[in-house]
Regions:
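Acidic (Asp/Glu) and glycine-rich low-complexity loops/linkers
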Residues: 1-160, 166-179, 183-222, 228-241, ...
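Short, catalytically relevant binding-site loops at active-site mouths
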Residues: 284, 294, 304
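C-terminal amphipathic alpha-helical segment
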Residues: 286-289, 307-309
Length: 369
């Protein structure tokens, strides 16, 4: 009796929940014709322009599924241009010296269950000035683009779930960029940079009309995407990825440089560093025309370590099954250790130490004339 009683209770509860769901969906269908009708959720879009007369020094934009772009104003007046829809409302105001742009999805929760997501929208902000204090942009799936002309004296925060983020602005405070699956790109004159992505690519550096990218410190991290740093000058650089590669080209880092990946390769081309730590599990490490004024610590499990006209004051190199080969620019005192591989290094009594350890790989180093 007890068992059949509880079975009846569970079945009855399930029927009640199913009935409530049907009522909710039925209400949505009755109140709004056909829920999946294209003209209802994916219909016409009306371009809206919001004119701003008040002055402001800070900008905050929070939208749902729209791209965000800052563009110069042609008439020295601020305008916020939105692509409104019947189900997304934009509010634009100036509150406590801050331009606030906010989007709200006006649909009921049950109207969103089977309806297409609100996407393909855009927000463009035409700014009359080129210098502001701070900027915050948050969007779910839209792209974020910040023009090279702008300067922010304080912090800039840019976040998107699946959209790409790019900025070429000059930023005096901290730049924080975050996306789950979107790519991140930053250039310009920067102070400190943090870039985080799960599966997107991260790129730092590049030339602008005002010059090369500069930054005090940069912390770049992605789970499965690539990390690239090009044409940049920094004081400290940290690049970390799970399964992607790390590439640095035409980069100057006056302090410490750290590059770490699990299964990707690490390569430096025309780079100068104060010190270098490079670690990878199954990828190779390549240093070409690269000079490290201090120490190089390079380690890989199954990949090889290769040099081409590279140099450092001291080197510690370690690989399990890969080889260590290449050319250095100045003499070194070599200390080698290999289990089954061959060894061919110059015999020298001057220079910094170069310790090389491998289990089954060969060791072959030459000194450039």
């Amino acid at each position: 009796m007890k068992k059949s009683f509880w079975i009846s209770i569970i079945v009855a509860g399930g029927l009640i929940l199913a009935g409530l769901a049907c009522i909710a969906v039925g209400h949505g269908l009755g109140g709004h014709r056909i829920l999946m009708e294209d003209s209802l959720y994916d219909g016409h879009t009306v371009d809206g322009t919001h004119h701003i007369s008040q002055d402001f020094d800070r900008i905050r934009i929070n939208v749902i599924a729209a791209g965000v772009e800052l563009i110069p104003s042609e008439d020295d007046k601020c305008r916020v241009m939105t692509k409104d829809s019947e189900y997304v409302e934009y509010t634009v105001s100036v509150v406590e010296d801050t331009l606030v742009v906010r989007a709200t999805d006006t649909r009921k929760w049950y109207e969103r269950l089977f309806a297409p997501s609100v996407s393909g929208r855009s927000v463009k902000v035409a700014l009359p000035r080129e210098e502001y204090k701070s900027l915050i942009v948050e969007t779910v799936s839209g792209q974020v683009n910040i023009n090279v002309r702008y300067t922010f004296s304080e912090d800039v925060t840019l976040t998107s779930t699946s959209g790409n983020i790019g900025t070429a602005a000059s930023i005096g405070g901290h730049l924080d960029m975050r996306s789950t699956s979107g790519d991140l790109y930053a250039m310009g004159f920067l102070n400190t940079v943090t870039a985080r992505s799960t599966s997107g690519k991260i790129t730092l550096g590049g030339k602008t009309v005002y010059g090369d990218c500069t930054a005090a410190t940069a912390d770049l991290e992605t789970t499965s995407g690539e990390i690239r740093v090009k044409t940049a000058t920094l004081e400290r650089l940290s690049a970390q990825t799970g399964s992607g590669g790390i590439r640095m080209e035409s980069v100057t880092v006056t302090g410490d440089t750290s590059a770490e990946t699990t299964s990707g390769g690490i390569s430096l081309l025309y780079a100068t560093c104060g010190s270098l730590t490079a670690e990878t599990g199954s990828g190779g490490i390549d240093l070409t025309d690269t000079t490290v004024t201090g120490h190089i610590q390079a380690e890989t499990t199954s990949g090889s370590i290769r040099f081409a006209r590279a140099d450092a004051e001291t080197l510690d190199l370690k690989t399990t099954s890969g080889s260590v080969k290449g050319s250095l620019r100045t003499p070194k005192i070599f200390y080698t250790d290999t289990t089954s591989g061959s060894v061919d290094v110059p015999k020298s009594t001057e220079g910094g130490h170069c310790e090389i350890e491998t289990t089954s790989g060969s060791i072959r180093i030459t000194i450039e004339d």
